């Protein structure tokens, strides 16, 4: 029973790490990265479809994304979706592919993005602490129901805290790495 609580908490904390990694992937660092387009959805035959399902996204140069639609008739729809997005760059349509040039980041933009990274990292740590609270509550319920002893409860609480500390440290490391990547010129 006690191990089930810890395993469930670990699994949920891992999901928080994965979610954070996805969010960080969407924050650009002045280099082309296919994950910048992960949140773009295109109206394709009346259905909102993720861009990566209707086109291949390649990186021919350090700051250029090349979007090649599988169906050439969707080119205008893709261009419309890219123009409507908040990427801050204009797509260039040459009739068969769309080129997106990722602009170089200004110092001010870098600092703003670093603040955003800190905020996202802080939110991930709050989520991990909420998971810890849920696990602690579950352990206390088991102790109240006499499923575990008071000593087992104390041990379980220490184990949950250790898992939480490890998860928070991992988030701090991820945040620091992303900040460093953003502030690199």
Swiss-Prot record:
Q: Name one Pfam family in it.
A: RRF
Protein biosynthesis among the record's keywords? Answer: yes
Please give the GO cellular component terms listed in this UniProt entry.
cytoplasm
Task: Name a single GO biological process.
Answer: translational termination
A molecular function GO annotation: ribosomal large subunit binding
State where the protein is found: Cytoplasm
UniProt keyword annotations, A-Z: Cytoplasm, Protein biosynthesis
The record's annotation in InterPro entries points to: Ribosome_recyc_fac, Ribosome_recyc_fac_dom, RRF_sf
Please tell me where this protein is predominantly located. cytoplasm
**Domain of life of the native organism:** Bacteria
Q: Which PANTHER family match?
A: MITOCHONDRIAL RIBOSOME RECYCLING FACTOR PSEUDO 1, RIBOSOME RECYCLING FACTOR
What HAMAP family does the annotation carry?
RRF (MF_00040)
Describe its function: Responsible for the release of ribosomes from messenger RNA at the termination of protein biosynthesis. May increase the efficiency of translation by recycling ribosomes from one round of translation to another.
What is the protein's given name?
A: Ribosome-recycling factor
User: What organism is recorded for this protein?
Assistant: Streptococcus pneumoniae (strain P1031)
Lineage summary: Bacteria, Bacillati, Bacillota, Bacilli, Lactobacillales
């Amino acid at each position: 029973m006690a191990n089930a609580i810890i395993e469930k908490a670990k699994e949920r904390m891992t999901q928080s790490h994965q979610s954070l990694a996805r969010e960080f992937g969407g924050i650009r660092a002045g280099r082309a990265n296919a994950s910048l387009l992960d949140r773009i959805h295109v109206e394709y035959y009346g259905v909102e479809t993720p861009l990566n399902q209707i086109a291949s996204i390649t990186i021919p140069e350090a700051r250029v994304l090349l979007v090649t639609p599988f169906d050439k008739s969707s080119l205008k729809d893709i261009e419309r979706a890219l123009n409507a997005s908040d990427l801050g760059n204009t797509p260039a349509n040459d009739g068969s592919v769309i080129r997106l040039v990722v602009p170089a980041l200004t110092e001010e933009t870098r600092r703003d993005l670093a603040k955003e990274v800190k905020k996202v990292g802080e939110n991930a740590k709050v989520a991990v602490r909420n998971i810890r609270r849920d696990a602690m509550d579950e352990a206390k319920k088991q102790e109240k129901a006499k499923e575990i002893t008071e000593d087992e409860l104390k041990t379980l609480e220490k184990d949950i805290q250790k898992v939480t500390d490890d998860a928070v440290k991992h988030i701090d490391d991820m945040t620091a790495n992303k900040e460093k990547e953003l502030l690199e010129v």
